[in-house]
Amino acid sequence: MPRSFLVRKPSDPNRKPNYSELQDSNPEFTFQQPYDQAHLLAAIPPPEILNPTASLPMLIWDSVLAPQAQPIAWASLRLQESPRVAELTSLSDEDSGKGSQPPSPPSPAPSSFSSTSVSSLEAEAYAAFPGLGQVPKQLAQLSEAKDLQARKAFNCKYCNKEYLSLGALKMHIRSHTLPCVCGTCGKAFSRPWLLQGHVRTHTGEKPFSCPHCSRAFADRSNLRAHLQTHSDVKKYQCQACARTFSRMSLLHKHQESGCSGCPR
């Protein structure tokens, strides 16, 4: 340890310490070289300090508990283990490798969490939290309600049709009630766009015209059907005369006209 740590700091901050005086005033920190045997013997502490139990009186623990604490009888443990060792070593060389069955696997240790302990823990949890038992019941009721709603069918009161959604049933009921009525002729329709196409037949408006010819139509669906007549692909064929048509309606009209098997 440096000697600067052993110096006492002066009280006056302006005063500078004199280290030479401090060395003369503390002669016990100076040792003579080389050390002789007398100095070494004086530095060794007495036996009372090295072994305090020899000089201190017996404590309460030593007088009361120490006689009860006896060393472990290792010999008795060895004697208890010796029959097992003798039993294992008593097998002869013939039995050790011929006709001996393999040792059975060790039985599993009994689980500390048995069914009774689990049930008791659940009972304690339900007793501590009364609302805990209602949560599974509420979930079960919600699942049952969803299943009933999924299985529930909406029946039409005008016919025997059934629908899984209420919106689909309402759209179907419009086909019975026909709420869209024409103001000119009184004809009713289930959809407003159907009524709009019908009104054009009274006004003569035909906003949908064919780009290939001069024909025009009041409804877009009629224009779409007319465009198939301009197509090169005619997939509807008459089996009697092998004529092809672009629309199924034209094929039916051809068959109703009395096809004799030859083109006219």
Swiss-Prot record:
It is found in: Nucleus; Cytoplasm. Changing P2A: Abolishes repressor activity on E-cadherin/CDH1 promoter and binding to KDM1A. GO terms for biological process: aortic valve morphogenesis; canonical Wnt signaling pathway; cartilage morphogenesis; epithelial cell migration; epithelial to mesenchymal transition; epithelial to mesenchymal transition involved in endocardial cushion formation; hair follicle morphogenesis; heterochromatin organization. Residues 2-7 are annotated as: Required and sufficient for interaction with KDM1A. One of its GO terms (cellular component) is cytosol. There is a cross-link at K98, K137, K146 (Glycyl lysine isopeptide (Lys-Gly) (interchain with G-Cter in ubiquitin)). GO terms for molecular function: DNA-binding transcription repressor activity, RNA polymerase II-specific; E-box binding; kinase binding; RNA polymerase II cis-regulatory region sequence-specific DNA binding; RNA polymerase II transcription regulatory region sequence-specific DNA binding; sequence-specific double-stranded DNA binding; zinc ion binding. Changing R8A: Loss of interaction with KDM1A. Residues 120-151 are annotated as: Required for FBXL14-triggered degradation. Residues 1-27, 86-115 are annotated as: Disordered. Involved in induction of the epithelial to mesenchymal transition (EMT), formation and maintenance of embryonic mesoderm, growth arrest, survival and cell migration. Binds to 3 E-boxes of the E-cadherin/CDH1 gene promoter and to the promoters of CLDN7 and KRT8 and, in association with histone demethylase KDM1A which it recruits to the promoters, causes a decrease in dimethylated H3K4 levels and represses transcription. Changing C210A: Impairs binding to KPNB1, IPO7 and TNPO1 and abolishes binding to KPNA2. Localizes to cytoplasm and nucleus. This is Zinc finger protein SNAI1. Expressed in a variety of tissues with the highest expression in kidney. Expressed in mesenchymal and epithelial cell lines. Changing S92A: Abolishes CK2 phosphorylation. Strongly decreases repressor activity on E-cadherin/CDH1 and CLDN1 promoters. Increases protein stability. Affects function in cell survival. Abolishes phosphorylation in the serine-rich region. Changing S100A: Lower sensitivity to BTRC-triggered degradation and impaired phosphorylation by GSK3B. Lower sensitivity to BTRC-triggered degradation, impaired phosphorylation by GSK3B and loss of cytoplasmic localization. It comes from Homo sapiens. Residues 10-40 are annotated as: LATS2 binding. Changing S115A: Lower sensitivity to BTRC-triggered degradation, impaired phosphorylation by GSK3B and loss of cytoplasmic localization. The gene is SNAI1. It comes from the Eukaryota. SMART domains: ZnF_C2H2.
